């Protein structure tokens, strides 16, 4: 586990890959499964993602369990080189909510090199979009190769962008070995339960 025995799950990935949409789908499912959840949304200069998430989770999470962190620099700075602001936000959560089970940490949009400091995230999910091209998995990058779970999101767009999901599946297996990959469509809520299963197996039941 991590900070004061609360599990921390980091979600990283390029701009537009669907990280915020994924958080919106994960929180109600984790809540329904009986977990007490907090959310931290990182961005460079704004609180927009945090504000949208807070509105989305009305009636599910108390407003003060959704926090925005403005990194003021490259997105990976706040999750890797200097995670102190995120760690402080987690500590504030656990002081107010000692029964908190898990905190989801959404990174600002970055590139394929984005990873989380292990002092910050117990479990790392890297989200890519089909719209970025079906060659993304084989381009590797630390996010793709080092994540505990790779999520290939926006599968509904595959026929519109000439992306081959089987190619992406094959390439993900080649570059990640036995590490898991999930294919999701957040809009249709497809594949989200599989992501929850991996979170439970990877960190909540660990």
Curated annotation (Swiss-Prot):
Compartmental location: Cytoplasm
Keywords annotated in UniProt: Chaperone, Cytoplasm, GTP-binding, Nickel insertion, Nucleotide-binding
Example GO biological process: urea catabolic process
InterPro entries from the UniProt entry: CobW/HypB/UreG_nucleotide-bd (IPR003495), P-loop_NTPase (IPR027417), UreG (IPR004400)
CC terms in the record's Gene Ontology section: cytoplasm
Top-level lineage group: Archaea
Main location: cytoplasm
Gene3D superfamilies: P-loop containing nucleotide triphosphate hydrolases
One GO molecular-function entry: nickel cation binding
Keyword set includes GTP-binding: yes
Binding site residues for GTP: 13-20
Function: Facilitates the functional incorporation of the urease nickel metallocenter. This process requires GTP hydrolysis, probably effectuated by UreG.
Similarity comment text for this entry: Belongs to the SIMIBI class G3E GTPase family. UreG subfamily.
Protein's name in the database: Urease accessory protein UreG
